C-alpha cells in the first residue's frame, strides 16, 4: 500500500500534465494528421515514469488512427514542453490512447432505454 501523499502527488501531476497537453494540442502542433482532439485523462504509472494519455477524437476510426499517428510523432516535443513548463527533471514517457468510454456510455444508455420501453409494454 502506498502512502496517501504519493498517490495525491501523482494524481495532481497527472492533472497538471493533462492541462498542459490540452494547451499544447490547442495551438502549438501543426501536424495536419491531428484532428479535433481533447485529452480526457492522464493515468500515471505508480513510479510516475510513464503516463497513458487518454484522448477523445472527433470523427470515425480512420480519423482517430491518423490523429494517434500524429500524436505519437509529436510525443518527444510534448515531453520536452512538459519538462520546461512543469519544471520536471524527468517527464514521463507518454503513451497516447483513444478513449472509447464515451461511445460505450452512449451504447449503454441506448440499451437501458430499450429495456425501459420493453418493461412499459409488458406492464400495459
Name every feature range the model reports, one short phrase each.
Residues 1-50, 56-124:
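Charge-rich, low-complexity N-terminal segments
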Amino acid at each position: 500500500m502506498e502512502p496517501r501523499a504519493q498517490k495525491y502527488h501523482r494524481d495532481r501531476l497527472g492533472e497538471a500534465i493533462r492541462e498542459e497537453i490540452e494547451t499544447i494540442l490547442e495551438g502549438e502542433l501543426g501536424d495536419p494528421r491531428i484532428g479535433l482532439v481533447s485529452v480526457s485523462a492522464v493515468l500515471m504509472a505508480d513510479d510516475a515514469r510513464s503516463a497513458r494519455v487518454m484522448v477523445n477524437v472527433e470523427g470515425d476510426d480512420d480519423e482517430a488512427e491518423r490523429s494517434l499517428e500524429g500524436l505519437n510523432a509529436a510525443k518527444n516535443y510534448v515531453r520536452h514542453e512538459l519538462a520546461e513548463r512543469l519544471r520536471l527533471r524527468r517527464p514521463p514517457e507518454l503513451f497516447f490512447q483513444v478513449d472509447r468510454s464515451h461511445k460505450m456510455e452512449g451504447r449503454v444508455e441506448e440499451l437501458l432505454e430499450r429495456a425501459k420501453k420493453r418493461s412499459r409494454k409488458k406492464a400495459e
